[in-house]
Amino acid sequence: MELDHTPPPSVLNDNCSASYMTPYATVIAMSGLYLLAIFYFCKKSKKMCQPMSDSIYPYQKRLTQLERELKNYLIDEESIEVDDFQIGQTADGFIFRGGVFPKTRNRFNAKVTTAVKISFPIVSKSISLLEDALRLSKLDHPNLIRLLAVSQLSFTVFRPMIALEWLPGGTLADYFQFKVREKDDSERSPIQLKDMLSILYQVSQALKYIHSQLDEFGQELTHGRIFTRNVLVTEPDLRKCEVKLGDFGDAPMGLEYSTPIIAYMPPEILCCAERIPPHRPENDVWMFGVFIWECLTLGAQPHFRKSVEEIKKSFRLPDRGLSCPPTCPLDVWTLVSDCLSEPHMRPRFASTTNASITSRLSELHHIVSPALFLYAIPNQSVCTCIEHHCQSVIHY
């Protein structure tokens, strides 16, 4: 006789009741899983925005050092505002107009206008921008812009964003363009040579300070960005304005730049066989000589519409392709010529003798007559190509 092992109906009903999940329990369980998924995504989302780990790995140690050394400048990304207005572009990234909000109760009423630099989404460019920020944080001079803040996301999302000091007068290049070259003769404010020498003296003081500093390898620091668009003015009145040298960075990297920047490069860099030649203090002196010429002409473009080969040919000329402005005194032009001489013959900024650039500018500022004025020199080109629409040889 076979035994019936089928459980009674009451036992079956009890087992089904034990394994059955009520609608409330289902909602609670699904909500818990949903919250866990959100928590995991929020925790990992910043890492998902980073470049591939194999591209970051070679820089990981240096990145940790940079974060430690820049800790006094780190602020929340919400405290840095970026406007739509783009000021310019460098080898490392873009520069926008922006601001920094202090950590106070009335923070939105105490906004500090700044220039915000954002790196390109390339690992090497990001590291280079952070290196520039570290270098600038160690410098303190009244004629150098200051580093104000570094976003904390610079070391998490790994696209650095730094805030730099910005002056209300804008750049010296903008002053020349909008206050001088685009104005009629009757609307232009007269510019004394004496006032321009004061501006040149302030820039030379900043370069003298930079060249007196040493890097981690014991070498003199250099600037490598001595252009009018990198000089900020406190107000649009050159008679009483102060200037600061900005955009401190590494040396110009070979021929990766456009022709307007190549026009400032010395022969030993432009004609060098190396792709990234070393930048030395005497290279800054050459660039400062071109900068003086640019100021004496009130914003004329050096080597206007010349190709790289044409610029190299200009180096063989006595004036290096930069003709002396008509109203420039001989003593001032002698300084320009000395800066554009052979590397071993160029004067220095950090020299303690009276032959230094700073000392000579100070002396010139005292002896130059206030009756000497500067006039805008038009850009002159021998180009007649259709590409540039060159129907005239004079361009303001």
From Swiss-Prot:
It comes from the Eukaryota. Pfam families: PK_Tyr_Ser-Thr. ATP binds at I87, G88, Q89, T90, A91, D92, G93, F94, I95, K111. Residues 42-396 are cytoplasmic. Expressed in the epidermis of larvae and adults and in vulval and rectal cells. Belongs to the protein kinase superfamily. Tyr protein kinase family. One of its GO terms (biological process) is defense response to fungus. This is Protein nipi-4. The lineage of its organism: Eukaryota, Metazoa, Ecdysozoa, Nematoda, Chromadorea. It comes from Caenorhabditis elegans.
